[in-house]
Structures are given as C-alpha cells and as structure tokens.
C-alpha cells in the first residue's frame, strides 16, 4: 500500500527529535549552542536546527515520498544544559554521511551553518564542535606536507620555528620590503611572512615583492648557512591569479606560500593545498576574519571548528592566537584546538572545549602559529604552551627593537634557544622565566636591550569567549 501524503505544517520535533537514536561511526556529529525565542520548547528548537540544516523545510511537502527521509534526515539525539547559562542549551545532532559531498568542507559548512542561522525561532546559534567520521576524513586531502615533512624541508629540529611578520604591513616598496626581510633572516629568524592584507597594491605589486623577497632569502641563506623562507601571500582576486602567483613563487625556488583561508574561501584553499601537494610547496594559513565568526560566545562558529576544517581542507601552518599576546584566546581552549591540529587522536575533553572524540587517522599534523602582540618576555610561556611543533612569530617584537630588525631577530633567537636549553635540562621554564632570560641576556646585548624595552608591556584583558565549564 502506498504512503499517504498529509499536507500541512507539523512540529519539527515530531520528525527530527530522536532521543533514542544511537549515532553511527559514519555519522557526522555536531554540537550547537542554541538560544531559542521565549516560549519555544527546547526540543522544538533543537529539532528545527536538525531539520533546517539537513532535509527539512517549514511545511510538509509531497516530494518527501520520492526519497527515504528516515535515511537522510539529521537527528537531534541529545540536549544538555550549558553550565552557568539558563537561556541556552547544547543540541547534539547526527547527520548521515551521504548528505555531504566527499572531501568538500564547503559543502559541509553550507549545510550546517547555512540558512538555519537566520531562523526566527532562534535568538542565537553557535556551532561549537564537529566530529568528522573517518569515512569523511579519508576523502579529504589534508595538509599538503605536514609537520614531519616541513621540518625536513626547512632542516629545523628540536625547537619551534621562529619567524615574524614584516612591518609596517602596508606601504613599503618592494625593494624596501625585501630589505626588511633580509635584516630579519640574517639576524636569526627562520622565516618571515607577508601580513594577511598585503596582496598586490599600488605601492607594491605582487611580482615586485616576490622578486625582492626571493633575493633577500637567498642572500640570508648564503650568509648564515641556514635554510630560510618567507610566506609569500598568494591570496588574490580570482583563483586564476592565485595560481599564477603560486607558480611564480615556485619559479623563484621559494619553499613556502601563504593563503588567507577564511576570506579566500574553503574552495580556493582546498585547491591551493592540492597544488602545493603536487608541486612540493609548503602552505602557511592565516585566519583573517575569524573573530567576526567565532568571538561571540552565543552566535557563530567556534574556532575549534574552523581549525578542524582547515586541517581537512589543507594547510601546513595555521594561526591559533597566543594566549599571552594581544589576541583573544584562553589557555585551555587554545590547547584544545591545537590538539586537533597536531594529534592523531583527540579524546572528548570539556575542560578544553572538545565535545567529541576525534580520530584523525594518519592525516598529517599542522604547525600551530603563535602571532600577535608577543615579545621576548613571553618566550618561556609560549614554549610551554605551544611546544616544539609550532611557529612563534614576533612582528613588533622584532622590528620594535631599538637597534633594528636584525637585533630584534637576534634577541628572539637567543631567548628561544635559552628556553629550549633550560627545558631540556629539566627546568620549569614558566616559573623560572625571568632567571632564564636574564642569564641569557648576559651574553647577548640584543636580548638585554629587548628585555628592558618590553619589560612593562602586557595584554591582561579578560577573555570574552570563555569555556562553559564549572
């Protein structure tokens, strides 16, 4: 007997609230923080999110009979209170894997954070976490190279990579830009980088910058005997222009390029990561625009989701904040998404904001990049927080040195190596930070001046987006 079509409107929870459902290993799981309109039951709000982010619409439609809705629909299977927040709750939703195109982060986000975020029944909605099933992970390219290969390419072992952003970020001619790159690299840095908003402006066209930077990198390598590099930002107006810039960086024998993955988009990022994998290039990723999306504690997408998506889309390095610098991010939350960038398995741990177990299988890891308002006094804490598989980037903390960028670079290199040596000797580098740095400064006038210059500089502001734990 054929199914009967009943026209009309029915409550979402009749179809999409399934508290008895046990998620499958192949399901994509999502945790949303929901704040519904007054008077709307939690189950209805949660079911509406499940429906509108999967197969549902506001009215029953006859064409449902042409498919197996029970197979394809998203299911809200659990609701939890948010500690310390009486208005909001967590909704856990399971999505069948067949709802998503293989390897497409663009498609996943279009479904999960598409129209549903404008739904009138919701006052606020935030995607807190995603558990990507292994069946989906295996369809993604992931980092073009990964941590191990990047260390081999750069010949850097046993410590974090050391870098800086060229300042001023805008306004320098190509030749002067290259001069600053050279000063930093000869002073002791491993890498320098374009800032996120340097592309190809009237004061400095991209080709000119690439050529002068390549000259600076090669000269610094010859003088120091070390492998050096510069993140050449290939973000562009069109994908075609992006690839043209990447190809030119390769022609110049540069080891690493850069992309602004949120403003550039996941489709462009995945394409560039695939190109890097085929062409033996490292890929540095900047997260410009992330705070517009992730900083509000009740609405948007948490950065841990954006970090997971980047690992799948592809990148060898990703900015993650600093904890101690000028940018938002507490220690435990930051460690939570650093784990998801680098580890092969990350267990559920609410104290770090991880709502699910996440198995990454054999997918390579991503270097965590600490950048933003950091200087030599922060070095012990940065090493303790980020560990060796990171890149520590001091922009103002290099160029702001009274003796210039080369001296600033030397100060940072001495501070880093002193902290690594102390850690390897078993010292508690955060507790003994002052003693470690002052001892090193006895043999480095550059470090001594840097310590004096920035001794009063702190960024002690309370975190806006705090973990929901008691």
Curated annotation (Swiss-Prot):
Record lineage: Bacteria, Bacillati, Cyanobacteriota, Cyanophyceae, Synechococcales
Enzyme Commission designation: 4.1.1.39
GO cellular component labels: carboxysome
The encoding gene: cbbL
Cofactor(s) this protein cannot do without: Mg(2+)
One BP term from GO: reductive pentose-phosphate cycle
Residues of the site described as Transition state stabilizer: 326
Residues engaged in binding substrate: 115, 165, 169, 287, 319, 371
Record's protein name: Ribulose bisphosphate carboxylase large chain
Entry note: cofactor: Binds 1 Mg(2+) ion per subunit.
Catalytic reactions on record: 2 (2R)-3-phosphoglycerate + 2 H(+) = D-ribulose 1,5-bisphosphate + CO2 + H2O; D-ribulose 1,5-bisphosphate + O2 = 2-phosphoglycolate + (2R)-3-phosphoglycerate + 2 H(+)
Oligomer status and interactors: Heterohexadecamer of 8 large chains and 8 small chains. Forms a CsoS2-CsoS1-RuBisCO complex.
